[in-house]
């Protein structure tokens, strides 16, 4: 019988992991392999039976010098022939062991939430995926001071982002800003960031996340300007769903729900945000879109 083992993924292994996400219908971003790996090069695991890879999981650590490190488990997929067997449980437990000293977050699918509760995770709220065709959205007429986020000092963006994520994540943000298939915007007021968001090209359409804003008008302005950029990228495309936009909101933010409804976006999917320790003290009223189901 082939020996089961788990190894840390290398950069070249990320194509296998992203491939599993794509096969599972998760619609990963075109540059998710590079961006995810940059977040924590020790945080991606591949399960093997002998020489054969059979599944993957991420256990990404976000160090925090002022508090308990935050960790996030995602990308948890076993290939179909090995689902429902002990190997998936071993892989999940290994990920939790790597983050044993962290407050761990997950986005659990509905059918697995009871299972995750058995491992000590408690539900905080639902995250809701909404999807819409941005080709019909209005243009932003706000006149607000919106700039390309790449022009800002990374430290300034990290400081703003850290208000809405449980730990600073400079490596993630630096990678998230870089690809040409990503577009990040920040809304400025008196030299300070009061909103920012990123759109990234995916296998089908675009995902927007994060989208953090101090009020709904700022969130709407960023969202509409990101949509305008998407329309520019897709105006000559005949690919199905080229102008589809996905935004993952929290049920905690009623204004985010109102925003997607005004744009006629449709609910398509949900997860439960769960934590292994206390729920982080985040202002979800300012979180109009989470970054990703895979990394938090």
Predicted regions and their residues:
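Contiguous mid-protein beta-loop-alpha structural module that forms a pocket-lining wall or clamp
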Residues: 80-151
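Hydrophobic, proline/glycine-rich low-complexity stretches
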Residues: 2-40
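Intrinsically disordered, low-complexity, positively biased terminal segments
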Residues: 2-3, 10, 14-15, 48, ...
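A short helix-loop-beta-strand connector motif used in the catalytic cores of GNAT acetyltransferases and
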Residues: 29, 34-55, 62, 72, ...
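Phosphate- and divalent-cation-binding pockets in alpha/beta enzyme and binding domains
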Residues: 56-58, 114-116, 255
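Short hydrophobic/aromatic-enriched beta-strand-loop microsegments
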Residues: 26, 124-129, 266-270
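Long, hydrophobic/aromatic-enriched structural stretches that serve as scaffold segments
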Residues: 56-59, 64, 69-86
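Core nucleotidyl-transferase/polymerase catalytic module
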Residues: 45-47, 60, 74-75, 96, ...
